[in-house]
Amino acid sequence: MSELTARTNDEGWETVFAAWLDTSHLNDKDAILVYSVGGGDAERNISTNIVRAIELAKARSAKVFGIVGRDSGYTAKHGDVVVVIPQANPGWVTPLSEAFQAVVWHCLVSHPALQIKKTKW
C-alpha cells in the first residue's frame, strides 16, 4: 500500500499500475486481472491507469484477463479473456459487476492452493 500511495503522489494516478508492473518485471509468463465496471477509456479520460497497465501488459506479451460491466471499455476490447457481466438493467451495472467480481475474488483467495493462512469460517 505504501508503494501505491507513494507512486500516486510522485508520478500521478494515470501510470500507477503500469509503473508497478514495470518495476515488478512483468513479462510474457505473467498475467494481469482487471476488475472494473467500465474497463477504462483513454479517449474519454476514464480509468486511464487501467488502460496504461493493459498497454504495458500487451507490449510485454503478458496475458490480460478481466471482469467488467461494459463491453465498450478498453479492457473488453483489448483483453485476452474478459467476462462482461450481462446487464438486464443499466442502472445496476455497478452493483452487479462489483458483486460478481467479489465472488470471483473470494473464490481465488479461498482456494486451498493459494491460502497462506486458513480462514476461520
Regions found by a protein language model. Give the residues of each.
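Glycine-rich phosphate-binding loops that contact phosphosugars or nucleotide phosphates
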Residues: 1-121
